[in-house]
């Protein structure tokens, strides 16, 4: 959430930044006007409360002197009525301010490229060269069915579209991948967490999914619970409402969890395969950092995600997302896209973001600076390390062989009992 004081004092700069994210200046002008009304009403109510205190003292003195205080009592009752009217106006204005400020996206960092959509993202670097095949390649969904390791038909029967069963060596490959990913992140100083797979609405607000993106989630009717769309939500909210000792920062968390997405608005997109599912595993990275180090931490986090792809020897590229393509809470985001041969393109497999103090303000996550003893908002970062199902898709396609088998990447073989190939059964 943005700082209302910052909008008030640096209106033009904030408006210019938010314009690049599709927010009209009229919205901010309305917000500014409401803020001015609110502050004026606060002055009025404080003046009336001061008058009420004077009237109360006059009544007490009159009673001590056994004098008639009926006029003072009438005056105080009128003051109380006026205060009540203003308080009601303040409550309405506060609600209007909240309805606007809670759906404003984060302001982009100065280094973020300005653009409207994914076409304006900027490629930063590439790693690895896509393999040149001398045979007709198959898509990962065809490979998965032929190898008897992925079963969409029964997934659709048991649940519905965009669900599947991993089976046999498919299940082992998935498990090997997320164990490998977690082990690599632990080497980089991350603490492993197994979080709840349901969170409450306050947690969804804290990380920015609520109120704006409720349609993208699965809520449990009649409860305060939501199935997590990403482990970012429980991991970040671990410290919601807390004050952390500054000496403990930075703090790194990692977790493997299922992620649940309604995929609202994705009808007709990626209807086959592992790219877009309602339920998928993802290894998440979350960091809590001081503001002065958070952008160094973003580079490290991105490198952590890249390290996984490099160890798996999967070609990828890194993009700096433009202002129009970044997520709601992000101030800066790098996307990692892995090469998918059957689609002859790169597809997103990780997104690493610095939200600065945007989530911390919503969730009230603060730290006590050991230098001056002051309590301040910290910066939160999050990133995929990696999306497991999409990594399975990339391995199946990049490591496929002419005979229909798939070579298991070397780094995963210790996790799969030394197996080197997934062969047709």
Curated annotation (Swiss-Prot):
InterPro entries per record: aa-tRNA-synt_IIb, aa-tRNA-synth_II, aa-tRNA-synth_II/BPL/LPL, Ser-tRNA-ligase_type_1, Ser-tRNA-synth_1_N, SerRS_1_N_sf, SerRS_core, tRNA-bd_arm
One Gene Ontology CC term in the entry: cytoplasm
Catalytic activity: tRNA(Ser) + L-serine + ATP = L-seryl-tRNA(Ser) + AMP + diphosphate + H(+); tRNA(Sec) + L-serine + ATP = L-seryl-tRNA(Sec) + AMP + diphosphate + H(+)
Name of one Pfam family that matches: tRNA-synt_2b
EC id: 6.1.1.11
Annotated binding of ATP, by residue: 261-263, 348-351
Keywords attached to this entry: Aminoacyl-tRNA synthetase, ATP-binding, Cytoplasm, Ligase, Nucleotide-binding, Protein biosynthesis
PROSITE patterns linked to this entry: AA_TRNA_LIGASE_II
Annotated GO MF terms: ATP binding; catalytic activity, acting on a protein; serine-tRNA ligase activity; transferase activity
Pathway(s) this gene product operates in, as recorded in its UniProt entry: Aminoacyl-tRNA biosynthesis; selenocysteinyl-tRNA(Sec) biosynthesis; L-seryl-tRNA(Sec) from L-serine and tRNA(Sec): step 1/1
Binding annotation for L-serine: 230-232, 284, 384
A Gene Ontology biological process term: seryl-tRNA aminoacylation
Compartment list: Cytoplasm
Function: Catalyzes the attachment of serine to tRNA(Ser). Is also able to aminoacylate tRNA(Sec) with serine, to form the misacylated tRNA L-seryl-tRNA(Sec), which will be further converted into selenocysteinyl-tRNA(Sec).
Family: Belongs to the class-II aminoacyl-tRNA synthetase family. Type-1 seryl-tRNA synthetase subfamily.
Domain notes per entry: Consists of two distinct domains, a catalytic core and a N-terminal extension that is involved in tRNA binding.
Annotated PANTHER family: SERINE--TRNA LIGASE, SERYL-TRNA SYNTHETASE
Subunit structure, as described in the record: Homodimer. The tRNA molecule binds across the dimer.
Protein name as it appears in the record: Serine--tRNA ligase
Protein encoded by which gene: serS
């Amino acid at each position: 959430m943005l700082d209302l004081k910052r909008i008030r004092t640096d209106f033009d700069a904030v408006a210019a930044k938010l314009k690049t994210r599709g927010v009209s200046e009229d919205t901010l002008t309305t917000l500014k006007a409401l803020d001015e009304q609110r502050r004026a009403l606060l002055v009025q109510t404080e003046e009336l409360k001061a008058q009420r205190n004077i009237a109360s003292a006059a009544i007490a003195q009159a009673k001590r002197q056994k004098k008639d205080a009926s006029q003072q009592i009438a005056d105080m009752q009128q003051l109380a009525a006026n205060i009540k009217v203003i308080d009601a106006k303040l409550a309405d204005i506060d609600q209007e301010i909240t309805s606007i400020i809670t759906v404003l996206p984060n302001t982009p960092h100065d280094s973020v490229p300005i653009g409207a959509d994914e076409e304006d993202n900027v490629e930063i670097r590439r790693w690895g060269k896509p393999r040149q095949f001398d045979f007709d390649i198959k898509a990962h969904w065809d490979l998965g069915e032929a190898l008897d390791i992925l079963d969409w038909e029964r997934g659709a029967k048991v649940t519905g579209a965009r669900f599947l069963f991993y089976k046999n060596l498919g299940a082992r490959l998935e498990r090997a991948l997320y164990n490998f990913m977690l082990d690599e992140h632990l080497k980089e100083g991350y603490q492993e967490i197994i979080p709840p797979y349901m969170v409450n609405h306050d947690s969804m607000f804290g990380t920015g999914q609520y109120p704006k993106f409720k349609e993208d989630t699965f809520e449990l009717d009649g409860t305060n619970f939501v199935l997590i769309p990403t482990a970012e939500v429980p991991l970040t909210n671990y410290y919601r409402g807390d004050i952390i000792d500054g000496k403990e920062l930075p703090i790194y968390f990692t977790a493997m969890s299922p992620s649940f997405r309604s995929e609202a608005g994705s009808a007709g997109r990626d209807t086959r395969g592992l790219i877009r599912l309602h339920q998928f595993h993802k290894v998440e990275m979350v960091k809590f950092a001081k503001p002065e180090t958070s952008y160094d931490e973003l580079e490290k986090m991105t490198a952590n995600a890249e390290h996984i792809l490099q160890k798996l020897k999967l070609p990828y590229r890194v993009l700096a997302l433009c202002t129009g393509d970044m997520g709601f809470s992000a101030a800066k985001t790098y996307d990692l896209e892995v090469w998918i041969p059957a689609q002859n393109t790169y597809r997103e497999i990780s997104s690493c973001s610095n939200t600065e103090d945007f989530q911390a303000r919503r969730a009230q996550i603060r730290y006590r600076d050991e230098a001056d003893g002051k309590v301040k908002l910290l910066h939160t970062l999050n990133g995929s390390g990696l999306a497991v199902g999409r990594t399975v898709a990339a391995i199946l396609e990049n490591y496929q062989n002419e005979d229909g088998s798939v070579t298991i990447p070397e780094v995963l073989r210790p996790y799969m009992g030394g197996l080197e190939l997934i062969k047709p059964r």
